[in-house]
């Protein structure tokens, strides 16, 4: 444990941010997995709904800094391409 008060605070803040980032990334992975399952099952209407949800979550994660903006944009693009190929 750190001896300096500001360092102790930083440890607490980093722990909170790490927990939040881990939660957000887990939600993203789950949402993407559900989208991919819908596409593979051929359930295109459900896949479209899931894609909009994934886009929203990725945009929020990028806004919070959990995921880089370019990375989020690239993932959204690739998922949209995957849906369009399935159609």
UniProtKB/Swiss-Prot annotation:
Q: Which Pfam families match?
A: Ribosomal_S20p
Q: Name one GO biological process term.
A: translation
Q: Which cellular components does GO assign to this protein?
A: cytosol; small ribosomal subunit
InterPro entries, A to Z = Ribosomal_bS20, Ribosomal_bS20_sf
Molecular function (GO) terms for this protein are: small ribosomal subunit rRNA binding; structural constituent of ribosome
Q: Which UniProt keywords apply?
A: Ribonucleoprotein, Ribosomal protein, RNA-binding, rRNA-binding
Does the record carry Membrane as a key word? no
Protein family membership:
Belongs to the bacterial ribosomal protein bS20 family.
Q: What does this protein do?
A: Binds directly to 16S ribosomal RNA.
Please give the NCBIfam families that the UniProt record associates with this protein: S20
Q: Fetch the PANTHER family from UniProt.
A: 30S RIBOSOMAL PROTEIN S20, SMALL RIBOSOMAL SUBUNIT PROTEIN BS20C
Q: What is this protein called?
A: Small ribosomal subunit protein bS20
Look up and give the organism this protein is from.
Alkaliphilus metalliredigens (strain QYMF)
The primary gene name is rpsT
């Amino acid at each position: 444990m750190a001896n300096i008060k500001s360092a102790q605070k930083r440890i607490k803040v980093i722990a909170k941010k790490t927990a939040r980032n881990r939660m957000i990334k887990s939600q993203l992975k789950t949402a993407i997995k559900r989208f991919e399952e819908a596409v593979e099952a051929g359930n295109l209407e459900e896949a479209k709904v899931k894609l909009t949800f994934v886009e929203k979550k990725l945009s929020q994660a990028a806004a919070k800094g959990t995921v880089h903006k370019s990375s989020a944009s690239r993932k959204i693009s690739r998922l949209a391409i995957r849906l369009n190929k399935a159609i």
